[in-house]
Amino acid sequence: MAKGFYISKTLGILGILLGVAAVCTIIALSVVYAQEKNRNAENSAIAPTLPGSTSATTSTTNPAIDESKPWNQYRLPKTLIPDSYQVTLRPYLTPNEQGLYIFKGSSTVRFTCNETTNVIIIHSKKLNYTNKGNHRVALRALGDTPAPNIDTTELVERTEYLVVHLQGSLVKGHQYEMDSEFQGELADDLAGFYRSEYMEGGNKKVVATTQMQAADARKSFPCFDEPAMKASFNITLIHPNNLTALSNMLPKDSRTLQEDPSWNVTEFHPTPKMSTYLLAYIVSEFKYVEAVSPNRVQIRIWARPSAIDEGHGDYALQVTGPILNFFAQHYNTAYPLEKSDQIALPDFNAGAMENWGLVTYRESALVFDPQSSSISNKERVVTVIAHELAHQWFGNLVTVDWWNDLWLNEGFASYVEFLGADYAEPTWNLKDLIVLNDVYRVMAVDALASSHPLSSPANEVNTPAQISELFDSITYSKGASVLRMLSSFLTEDLFKKGLSSYLHTFQYSNTIYLDLWEHLQQAVDSQTAIKLPASVSTIMDRWILQMGFPVITVNTSTGEIYQEHFLLDPTSKPTRPSDFNYLWIVPIPYLKNGKEDHYWLETEKNQSAEFQTSSNEWLLLNINVTGYYQVNYDENNWRKIQNQLQTDLSVIPVINRAQIIHDSFNLASAGKLSITLPLSNTLFLASETEYMPWEAALSSLNYFKLMFDRSEVYGPMKRYLKKQVTPLFAYFKIKTNNWLDRPPTLMEQYNEINAISTACSSGLEECRDLVVGLYSQWMNNSDNNPIHPNLRSTVYCNAIAFGGEEEWNFAWEQFRKATLVNEADKLRSALACSNEVWILNRYLSYTLNPDYIRKQDATSTIVSIANNVVGQTLVWDFVRSNWKKLFEDYGGGSFSFANLIQGVTRRFSSEFELQQLEQFKEDNSATGFGSGTRALEQALEKTKANIKWVKENKDVVLKWFTENS
């Protein structure tokens, strides 16, 4: 699944006035899942009463829970192994007499008895069953031995089970089939089998669609809903004959429903063995564009009819074939299915979902309008497609055994998405962006004592809520970062060789991460060119099984080098011990005298002449930031690097110019450097035109903005930024022919946006005139938007910030009329830029009205308001006053409480705010915090670190900005 949530990586770039993601700020992934919610509210909720349901035997369990009973444990017993399912579903896309949208279904599951048992335990959630005889299900044996009679059945809501108690025992090695009929609500909760709605031609349209990951297939039909319980699925959909039915496989048969010719019955080919969370089925009136790949795979891009008619699916179609071919070559394994459908949904909580053969997306992650979409929208489409298609092999064909190794699925896809996207767009240099988008972003979280390892013991991950918490930036971005490091020190060829062997060995089955290490080790052992200081497992377990990362410190006078666990607050203690004592085996590529070399740090400290320099030499470690660690030097080497940057910055690789800024700011935040050193590392920016160093600087300085934009420090800081960005603004003014054209490369186009955003926010009058003039032209002729799509986010935001009610109301009207989701997203974010308190308060009230703001967008909109210094207090008051209602309304649906808590607390830096946060935790302990539980602990830790940092650095920072502005 793509990162959420969560927030598009590239959309974040366009919203710099509100703040580029701070390196020292906790950021959850954008793209978060519909399941990433607290399940307690769901577990206590009663399934909707639906017409035709019949009562059965006991429906609830005794409040006194006997944990020894298998149905009171969250993990399935190993007694039964599913073989296949026959599932028929009929969604009703108009409400019934009670005003509910429902679906009806029937299911037959065939399973083998693996251990003798007298109870059948299968997942079921919010389903009402129609009795078969006296019980919810019917059971029969395949073979001569009859099945035992059913004694009773019960629904255990806490563990989400349908439990069938038998009068006798199932026989080990024998097969059985169990039938059921059921009804469920086709709710708008973005989970399981749900409905999505949109307007077209003034009419409301309803789509029946799915989101099963991580634990919501059970909400659609009774199933063994764990990733290792792979089976073949035979799906049949009954649907109105004017609509199209899709599923993981191609249709096998389509016929008219005999009893009602206005309905069709579409039966699909059986799937290969696969996990329940990868199932998908959709009923809609969407249209498609199609192509056939060179490997004869049918490719279709589905979306709302108007979007397809206007060509908004063409770009996705253009890049899908090349990306599929790239991964087939990269994995040395053919694409496993005959077709690849990708569909853009109006309501979808995650960024996308890798359902096998039927990938679902948010509209903004799949549709692209060349006339209205920006270059960042285009980059988002190609990278998210690459992420999801990478999963078709790594995750779908071979699947982790349990969610504790989710990082292997998502981290791998988050790494190779850059490779696949780079293949589709070779001129964009996308592979470098992983440093900004993943490595540096996740280090902000992983530097906290409350972080967690990539892989957890399986017994620590049991409940749906615990599973949901794993869908975070550690899983995605740290996973990507350490796998990239592994590929780098092995070489890409060896990495691919081991990967191919792994996929061929475990196809259609499940693995743990150690299986990958074993196959990579086999690749290493098959050659002699690459020599490692230890086995792959010995090296990598230190990066997987302990949280955090090291800072590598080198003294260029003595050649001494040592490592230590980097913590943002060096006085804090890790929340869990490490078997490796927080030491790593560290690969260190370095640059000295213009030559690159490589070194392994295998112990806590060492000494080497390789790291000694003469008076006119400087040393640079972690070339191109392939390693997942930060680097510190003696002060003399730092000064040499600064002199080099201000003399001839081109000698230092672009990525390392960004690294110098990023690492030094983080080291200063942790008290390992004087804060003036990283500030001095930004002086060269007056001569810098490349995107990555500027982005690293703005991200780092955004932390200063968050800490000081309510204090006297902010004035001198703005003056310094204005001084530094003025040459960049002038550079792009010339390069773009006075803003009429766009720079030729992706990175330059991104830095043009940085130049305008920073110039406007720091008070450059020429920038203000530019954005106000462009926005006024649009207001005077709303049918003709003169603002280039690349610049719209920053122009909209700044014009609304400089303006008043009239500018805001115009943007709101355009947002309400927007038919392209990318344009709507830009406007929705910009509406939070107002400096009028009453306008922001009104906008805040809109966010919880689904008629104004879709549920999937509520969190990001509220966080956008909180990012605005004027709106931050409003949001905090709103959240505290309404937490219980927020939790009740969104706790089991689309609301990402982790994003919300992180977004509203990122400015907290006073004792008073810490007290408020602690009181908030105490006041709402009974209600709970859902997927925000870990985020709340991180917010408390971060607030304490902020308080300490501000006390220690405020006066020094004020003095430095005053002297240098």
Curated annotation (Swiss-Prot):
Check the UniProt entry and state the signal peptide residues, or none: none
Cofactor(s) it depends on: Zn(2+)
Where's the active site on this chain? E388 (proton acceptor)
Q: Which biological process, per GO, is one annotated for this protein? A: proteolysis
The record's keywords, sorted A to Z, are:
Aminopeptidase, Angiogenesis, Cell membrane, Developmental protein, Differentiation, Disulfide bond, Glycoprotein, Hydrolase, Membrane, Metal-binding, Metalloprotease, Phosphoprotein, Protease, Signal-anchor, Sulfation, Transmembrane, Transmembrane helix, Zinc
Q: Where are the transmembrane segments?
A: 9-32
Q: Which residue ranges are assigned to the Cytoplasmic compartment in the record's topology?
A: 2-8
Report biased composition (Low complexity) as residue ranges.
47-64
**UniProt KW Cell membrane keyword:** yes
Q: Point out the annotated site residues (description: Transition state stabilizer).
A: Y476
Q: Does the keyword Hydrolase apply?
A: yes
UniProt lists the family membership as follows: Belongs to the peptidase M1 family.
What name is this protein filed under? Aminopeptidase N
Q: Which organism is it from?
A: Rattus norvegicus (Rat)
